[in-house]
């Protein structure tokens, strides 16, 4: 039987989602819990592998089990054992051919920034602090330029190993908040550090160091050296996972390009 688990976690005290040799990770917490229940190792498969310090409002993983436990009891058993910075929101059964990673057709990230004269220790780890005044309208107009299908070679880590760096963004916008702004971006998928590089670039636009007209040129150049900065993980949230094409079409229209990840080799 294949089980789908929806979770949320606060990423400050994790080295990321994926198992690490030395260090606390989200995957480690769940596989340790499931091993105790099954008396054997149980591998979990996530929809996304968040990095160190990145939070998740909605994340999924699946695993296979032979245990005959009601769904409500799965949720109760997990939450009773898990630490306070992880929570299981829902547990359901899925078809045996369902795969959390390859059936994912879209993801939304939110990057939170607060602006003030001084750093607020109570925001530490939850939002990124930027003291400078930024042109948010200009940043938003630059952000809109990324909507569509592009090769994001110049806007991801040079450590990115996947062959195709073409991704489709359905949403890319700066939203003003009471104490700063959020960058919200929804796409078919994201390359390693892609969201953080986009944020860093948009902040440079807000400071007047880049123009809106630079976006097409930088996409065309495919040169990471032209966009050298990466925003910190602090303030980055995996906000939503789309496992249903119809939900994605409902949110962004029937004309969008859907990337079916069962034909891709990247998360």
From Swiss-Prot:
Disulfide bonds: none annotated. It catalyses: uridine(38/39/40) in tRNA = pseudouridine(38/39/40) in tRNA. SUPFAM superfamilies: Pseudouridine synthase. It is an enzyme of class 5 (isomerase). One of its GO terms (biological process) is tRNA pseudouridine synthesis. The active site is at 51 (nucleophile). Substrate binds at residue 109. It comes from the Bacteria. Its EC number is 5.4.99.12. InterPro entries: PsdUridine_synth_cat_dom_sf, PsdUridine_synth_TruA, PsdUridine_synth_TruA_a/b_dom, PsdUridine_synth_TruA_C, TruA/RsuA/RluB/E/F_N. It holds the Pfam family PseudoU_synth_1. GO terms for molecular function: RNA binding; tRNA pseudouridine(38-40) synthase activity. Keywords: Isomerase, tRNA processing. Formation of pseudouridine at positions 38, 39 and 40 in the anticodon stem and loop of transfer RNAs. Homodimer. HAMAP family: TruA. PANTHER family: PSEUDOURIDYLATE SYNTHASE (PTHR11142), TRNA PSEUDOURIDINE SYNTHASE-LIKE 1 (PTHR11142:SF0). Belongs to the tRNA pseudouridine synthase TruA family. This is tRNA pseudouridine synthase A. It comes from Staphylococcus aureus (strain MSSA476). The lineage of its organism: Bacteria, Bacillati, Bacillota, Bacilli, Bacillales.
């Amino acid at each position: 039987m294949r089980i789908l688990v929806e979770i949320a976690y606060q990423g400050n005290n994790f080295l990321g989602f994926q198992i690490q040799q030395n260090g606390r990770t989200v995957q480690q917490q769940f596989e340790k819990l499931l091993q105790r229940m099954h008396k054997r190792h149980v591998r979990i498969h996530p929809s996304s592998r968040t990095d160190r310090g990145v939070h998740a409002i909605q994340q999924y993983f699946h695993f296979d089990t032979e245990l005959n436990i009601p769904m409500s009891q799965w949720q109760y058993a997990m939450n009773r054992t898990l630490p306070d910075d992880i929570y299981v929101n829902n547990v359901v059964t899925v078809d045996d051919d369902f795969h959390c990673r390859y059936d994912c057709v879209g993801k939304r990230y939110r990057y939170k920034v607060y602006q003030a004269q001084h750093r607020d220790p109570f925001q530490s780890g939850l939002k990124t602090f930027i003291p400078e005044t930024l042109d948010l309208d200009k940043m938003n107009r630059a952000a809109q330029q990324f909507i569509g299908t592009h090769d994001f070679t110049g806007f991801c880590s040079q450590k990115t190993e996947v062959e195709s760096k073409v991704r489709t963004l359905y949403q890319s916008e700066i939203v003003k908040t009471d104490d700063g702004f959020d960058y919200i971006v929804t796409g078919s998928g994201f390359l390693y550090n892609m969201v953080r590089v986009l944020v860093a670039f948009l902040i440079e636009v807000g400071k007047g160091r880049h123009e809106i007209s630079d976006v097409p040129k930088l996409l065309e150049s495919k040169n990471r050296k032209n966009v050298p900065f990466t925003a910190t993980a602090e303030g980055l949230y995996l906000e939503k996972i789309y496992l249903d094409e119809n939900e994605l079409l409902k949110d962004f229209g029937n004309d969008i390009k859907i990337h079916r990840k069962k034909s891709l080799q990247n998360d």
